[in-house]
């Protein structure tokens, strides 16, 4: 069992609320002891954690730098301006808004800026790798707007001619390029051509691969996109926040949609943490990190394919993989539960043309961002792939799962996670 040691800040929490302190402590141990493969998760640095938990949470800052409704903003304005400037430098954006609370509100703000209720949007279908906010009928994006979806072909690949035909048919006001479970690189130039042909704005949701873009290992949506949204966690290794980047001509509409359209004051501690993460993303070490993320994904994919796993699209070009387990006599939920018991954490996920229900789908989704942050490389991908194969083949054998969990913890002990270096046996 691991113990954690903290300074005065955690001691104060322990004294004030030992119940919450204990749960946080247990979560720290869990994050250390487990191999975390959830594609949308990562480990942030101690510097990002420090900014996130700073006294900036005490401040209220409605408005934008130089145009606030409350006084006492001199330092907050500097912090937000630094975050904006760093985002522009990292991504080459003309305008940046760093205030959205998370990815979904960021996407909603874009719709608020350019659409009226009932207008048409065209995005990737959720069961084929899209996101709830790209027009799913259970999301506000699918309730307030006429949401049309494009799908993948039988090989699990985007068919740009089919997307073009859909766009010509429905004439969307916004064409959305982005995903939450698509392991291939998007062709932004083709999306731009389609958008221009039908007179649509091109919105790119790069929440999953923003860090890869920053690191130069994934094509950039600039200058093709009119608007780009992203979360600041996932592959970017920042806090739980979001950004909207756009061409200068859309700056006023975007800013007005975020505030006062969607939300009140920004979370200043998050803004500071975004600035810190963007500084980290501008370094050579971050470029090496993102290259390793992609290399690890490819290496793990090779091992899993060799073990007979059916990877949707036959592999990966980014950080994530989607695996169809139909040939393994196990459902996605069963696999996710068994892997978790063995110390390997990921999520069950629908696959294209899935015949099973969303809460008990045929597939699993995994990504390599978090394990790469720990220092895992090719050798560990071989070990991990073999572990996953053993779990799937013995998913009902609790003794085997417990044995693998011990192996996982031993492996994790060799690779301390960022922000959790204080954990010791």
From Swiss-Prot:
EC numbers, comma separated: 2.1.2.1
Modified residues (N6-(pyridoxal phosphate)lysine): 234
Pathway: One-carbon metabolism; tetrahydrofolate interconversion; Amino-acid biosynthesis; glycine biosynthesis; glycine from L-serine: step 1/1
Keyword RNA-binding: no
Pfam families documented for this protein: SHMT (PF00464)
Domain of life from the UniProt record: Bacteria
Amino acids binding (6S)-5,6,7,8-tetrahydrofolate: 126, 130-132
UniProt subcellular location: Cytoplasm
GO biological process terms on file: glycine biosynthetic process from serine; tetrahydrofolate interconversion
Principal subcellular localisation of the protein: cytoplasm
Keywords: Amino-acid biosynthesis, Cytoplasm, One-carbon metabolism, Pyridoxal phosphate, Transferase
Site (Plays an important role in substrate specificity): 233
Enzyme class: transferase
HAMAP family reported in the protein's UniProt record: SHMT
Family: Belongs to the SHMT family.
Role according to the record: Catalyzes the reversible interconversion of serine and glycine with tetrahydrofolate (THF) serving as the one-carbon carrier. This reaction serves as the major source of one-carbon groups required for the biosynthesis of purines, thymidylate, methionine, and other important biomolecules. Also exhibits THF-independent aldolase activity toward beta-hydroxyamino acids, producing glycine and aldehydes, via a retro-aldol mechanism.
Protein name: Serine hydroxymethyltransferase
Organism: Desulfotalea psychrophila (strain LSv54 / DSM 12343)
């Amino acid at each position: 069992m691991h113990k954690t040691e903290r300074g005065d800040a955690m001691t104060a929490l322990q004294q004030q609320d030992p119940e919450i302190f204990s749960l946080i402590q247990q979560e720290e141990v869990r994050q250390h002891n487990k191999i975390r493969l959830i594609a949308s998760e990562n480990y942030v640095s101690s510097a990002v954690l420090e900014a996130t938990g700073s006294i900036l949470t005490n401040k209220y800052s409605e408005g934008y730098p130089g145009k606030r409704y409350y006084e006492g903003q001199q330092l907050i304005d500097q912090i937000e301006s630094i975050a904006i400037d760093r985002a522009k430098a990292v991504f080459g954006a003309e305008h940046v808004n760093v205030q959205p609370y998370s990815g979904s509100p960021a996407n909603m703000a874009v719709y608020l800026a350019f659409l009226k209720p009932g207008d048409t949007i065209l995005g990737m279908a959720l069961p084929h790798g899209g996101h709830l906010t790209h027009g799913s009928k259970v999301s506000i994006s699918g309730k307030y707007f006429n949401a049309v979806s494009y799908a993948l072909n039988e090989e699990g690949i985007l068919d740009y001619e089919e997307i073009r035909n859909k766009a010509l048919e429905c004439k969307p006001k916004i064409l959305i390029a982005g995903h939450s479970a698509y392991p291939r690189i998007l062709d932004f130039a083709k999306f731009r051509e389609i958008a221009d042909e039908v007179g649509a704005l091109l919105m790119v949701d790069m929440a999953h691969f923003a860090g890869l873009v920053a690191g130069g290992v994934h094509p950039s949506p600039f200058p093709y996109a009119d608007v780009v949204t992203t979360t600041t966690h996932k592959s970017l290794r920042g806090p739980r926040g979001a950004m909207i980047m756009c061409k200068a001509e859309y700056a006023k509409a975007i800013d007005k949609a975020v505030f006062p359209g969607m939300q009140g004051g920004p979370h200043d501690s998050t803004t500071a943490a975004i600035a810190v993460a963007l500084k980290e993303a501008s370094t050579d070490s971050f470029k090496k990190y993102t290259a390793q993320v992609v290399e690890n994904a490819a290496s793990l994919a090779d091992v899993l394919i060799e073990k007979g796993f059916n990877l949707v699209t036959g592999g990966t070009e980014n950080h994530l993989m989607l695996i169809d387990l139909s040939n393994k006599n196990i459902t996605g939920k069963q696999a996710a539960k068994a892997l978790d018991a063995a110390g390997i954490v990921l999520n069950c996920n629908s696959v294209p043309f899935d015949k099973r229900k969303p809460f008990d789908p045929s597939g699993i989704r995994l990504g390599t961002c978090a394990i790469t942050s720990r220092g895992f490389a090719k050798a560990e991908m071989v070990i991990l792939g073999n572990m996953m194969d053993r779990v799937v083949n013995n998913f009902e054998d609790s003794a085997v799962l417990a044995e693998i969990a011990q192996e996982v913890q031993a492996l994790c002990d060799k690779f301390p996670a960022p922000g959790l270096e204080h954990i010791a046996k």
